[in-house]
Amino acid sequence: MIIGIIGGGASGMAAAIAAAQWECNEVILFERQARLGRKLQATGNGRCNLSNLNMDLQHYHGDAPAFAAPALDRFGVEETLHWFRDLGLCTVCETTGRVYPYSDQANSVVDVLRFALERPNITLVTGSEVTKVKRMDSGFQVDCEGFSYSGDKLI
């Protein structure tokens, strides 16, 4: 199965890593910037707050808690920290419950994610903006400046 993912930020990189764990999948990650995770490097004043030990539905302040509930139930704090540990990232928890990389630098998070993307079944398309997405009978087509990609699923 060919899975396309538009956006090379934290969510896009995580989705690509997760999808590529099944080696039968081919993953194409599209990012218009030349480098992946650029905004991630600036989060948390350059420290990158990964999670919070107090993360649960009681602390959700959005308009649709029913929408957030399945995600929080399925991939909570422990699962998040375990996922980052499996990628090789050490973390530290502050007394406030905030979780940061042990290095206290967002670059550590970006580096770990980029390293995890270095798999034979992941293709990175960077520095090229997606100009058109077209739904096809058998999946999708993504047009980038001068290139066209087809696949089965699109995130």
Where are these regions (language model features)?
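Short beta-strand to alpha-helix junction loop
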Residues: 68-76, 95-115, 125
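Glycine-rich active-site loop/strand segments that organize a redox cofactor
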Residues: 45-95
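N-terminal Rossmann-like FAD-binding beta1-loop-alpha1 element of flavoenzymes
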Residues: 2-29
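Nucleotide donor/acceptor-binding cores
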Residues: 1, 24-25, 140, 152
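Short N-terminal binding/cap micro-motifs at the start of the first secondary-structure element
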Residues: 12-14, 36-39
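Predominantly flavin-linked oxidoreductase catalytic cores and closely associated redox partners
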Residues: 107-108, 112-155
